[in-house]
Amino acid sequence: MAPPTRQLLNAVLVLLLLLATNHQGTGVVVASELRCQCLTTLPRVDFKNIQSLTVTPPGPHCAQTEVIATLKDGHEVCLNPEAPLVQRIVQKILNKGKAN
């Protein structure tokens, strides 16, 4: 095979792979939602920096409880649900919600 033909074949192959990847892109997002979101956790975070808190119970997507804090600067951090400080933060937020 002559070099220009090989380059053309490689370019076509790359284009086909990109099109196939782009077409399957939606499925990849769904697959990533079906697994644990927290790979590492923090044992503590300053309560004043938390904007919102999401607690996801164990389920088919993940066998462990996940606590995800959205901080006031927009960052999301995973907290260790077993840590006493995290449990107190969750209780404070739950009690605050009951008071309203």
Curated annotation (Swiss-Prot):
Disulfide bonds join 36-62, 38-78. One of its GO terms (cellular component) is extracellular space. Residues 1-31 form the signal peptide. The keyword Isomerase does not apply. Keywords: Chemotaxis, Cytokine, Disulfide bond, Inflammatory response, Secreted, Signal. Pfam families: IL8. GO terms for molecular function: chemokine activity. At least expressed in the lung and trachea. This is C-X-C motif chemokine 2. The gene is Cxcl2.
